[in-house]
Amino acid sequence: MEEGKPSATAVISALVRAAHLLWDQPPKIFEDTLALQLSGCESEAALKVQMDRLEAEVARTTNPDFALAMRRSVTAAVVTRSRYLEDEVGQAVRRGVSQYIILGAGLDSFAYRRPELANFLHIFEVDHPATQE
């Protein structure tokens, strides 16, 4: 991890959430409208460059088919995990839970995207300081 920069895992997660929102066919599993901005990409074109670069890095050590499969499986894992967690938080709020602790928060955008839930919670995001700057 570079000093003063988010972890690669946090950035990749944001890239994947943005790519899912912009490019995957409906219905969307998870809609993170802030992911593109959080990923550090200034445009959809910049996102494409970053996603293609990541896929090419995997392809260099494996093969293009495996790289594409990895991209798809990582996307599926990230967006389904995010959706599941937010669904569970919604149910917890309805049961009266008042705290949400996000360990390894990375570039999470929950508090900004979900004010209808966040307004009922004390949210604690815990991660390496560089990721949260």
Residue ranges and their predicted role:
Residues 1-101, 107-133:
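Rossmann-like AdoMet
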